[in-house]
Regions:
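Transmembrane helical cores of multi-pass ion-transport proteins
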Residues: 1-464
């Protein structure tokens, strides 16, 4: 009775019917100078995380995937998503939890002496099927049961994963004390410069346009600047840096063929791949819908409406396509998507937004084109990548009410500021109620982190 009661394809039909009449205007409305300006700085805002994730991906998968694959996957997936999805203001890209799942899958394949890429392809294809079926069954409607409680724990987990990967990479540099401290200082300087430049729009220096330019171009400029400084002879005399491992010419890692030989995986493991795929599908379902819901928030003043089911179906198809050619999976990226909405806002109050497919398509086309200068990325020190991860972790923490309550619960009751929402909760609800609620969230986060640390459960950790 449960399956028969599902109105199959209803949500997809409604999304397509609502979005099809607007499709031409989605492209036409973006043919402006504002879109060109937005593409130029959104490229740099998206490019820095792509390079960071590419470097981490290479280290965590034994070189099976690297910067080349992340660039190509992000570029192609982003262009396809901009052209096909219902909400073009959402950007797709590499995410921390997807990286964690991929790393856990690689470790499990190594432990079981299984070929990684064939297993990866089967898991991705099963996930693709599950996401498409979920979109056909109108499952995105379930996201209304996802509350701020879940979102805060989810974002805290994402932030901690960024910080963990950064510190893990830096720890490997401490085989020599001087090299380790040089790497640690470089990462801290990179993180501080990224944070400072990204927040420059809130300063009082220079003109509004100049502040916006510094803020938007800042993180990518920091990577270039710190890399250039690391190549100076005076700095190199202080110690050597581990740098990104890049091929001399563009190509897939290890010189492999484009399509993964999926038949190289034993037959019974092809069916077993559906088990981890369930957890990856849950992760993508939550990440995708939470991000798109954030983009469609009434505070962003979007007028053309949401299309959750069509967005999920598009992501499912992209996941399947990336899997069969062994490219990293992409998912909706919250920070980049919100930057896109802000970049296309009109006026200082942002009461109107140009909703277009041009910018998303253009940004990811530029990311794909950057693969032509791939060898130059081999100069980037790995501590710079760690610094970008530290910055991203700090950025995800910002505005997280759970993490803010972890601090305010210790404040002196006589010194609480009722004008601050988190501190006002302490006054209205009482310290005990706030502390118990925060403790439950902390226990959930700790349980998830314990799953990550246990090799036997690392595969299911990102989606639990």
């Amino acid at each position: 009775r449960g399956l028969r009661s599902i109105q199959w394809l209803r949500g997809l039909r409604e999304d397509v019917g609502r979005k099809a009449p607007l499709y031409f205007s989605d492209w036409r409305d973006g043919l402006t100078r504002k879109s060109l300006a937005a593409i130029s700085f959104l490229f740099f805002a998206c490019f820095a995380p792509v390079i960071a994730f590419g470097g981490a991906m290479g280290a965590l998968t034994g070189g099976a995937m690297g910067v080349s694959e992340v660039l190509v996957s992000c570029g192609l997936s982003g262009m396809a998503y901009a052209a096909l999805a219902g909400q073009p203001m959402t950007f797709v890209g590499p995410t921390g939890l997807t990286l964690a799942f991929t790393a856990a899958l690689y470790q499990w394949c190594t432990f079981m002496s299984l070929p990684f890429l064939p297993m990866y392809a089967w898991v991705g294809c099963w996930t693709s099927l599950m996401l498409v079926v979920a979109s056909m069954a109108n499952a995105s409607g379930l996201i209304r049961y996802c509350t701020r409680f879940t979102e805060d724990v989810f974002n805290a987990l994402l932030a901690f994963n960024f910080l963990s990967e950064a510190l893990r990479s830096l720890a490997t540099e401490f085989v020599d004390a001087s090299r380790g401290f040089l790497a640690f200082d470089t990462a801290l300087i990179t993180a501080w410069l990224c944070q400072t430049t990204a927040a420059f729009r809130n300063k009082r220096y220079l003109s509004a346009g100049a502040r916006e330019a510094v803020s938007d171009f800042g993180p990518a400029a920091v990577i270039v600047g710190v890399t250039a400084v690391s190549l100076l002879p005076a700095v190199q005399r202080l110690g050597d840096f581990a740098r990104l491992s890049m091929p001399s010419t563009f190509g897939l890692s290890g010189g492999r063929e484009l399509f993964v030989n999926m038949l190289a995986l034993p037959a019974h493991f092809r069916w077993f791949a559906a088990f981890p795929a369930v957890f990856l599908a849950v992760l993508f379902f939550l990440d995708q819908n939470i991000t798109v819901r954030t983009v469609n928030s009434p505070s962003n003043n979007l007028k053309k409406g949401a299309a959750y089911h069509l967005d999920l179906a598009t992501l499912g198809l992209l996941t399947g396509g990336a899997s069969v050619v062994g490219l990293p999976w992409m998912c909706s990226a919250t920070v980049q998507s919100l930057n896109h909405v802000r970049a296309m806002s009109l006026g200082s109050d942002g009461t109107e937004v140009v909703e277009t497919r041009v910018t998303g398509f253009g940004v990811h086309a530029a990311i794909l084109a950057s693969a032509l200068i791939l060898p130059s990325f081999s100069a980037v020190p790995l501590p710079v990548i760690s610094g970008v991860f530290l910055y991203l972790g700090q950025k995800v923490m910002k505005g997280n009410q759970f993490l803010q309550r972890c601090k305010t619960v210790w404040l002196d009751e006589d010194r609480l500021n009722i004008d601050c929402q988190d501190e006002r909760q302490m006054v209205v609800l009482g310290r005990g109620a706030v502390a118990r609620f925060t403790a439950i969230q902390a226990l959930c986060l700790a349980a998830l982190w314990a799953l990550k640390l246990n090799p036997a459960t690392a595969l299911i950790f990102p989606s639990v």
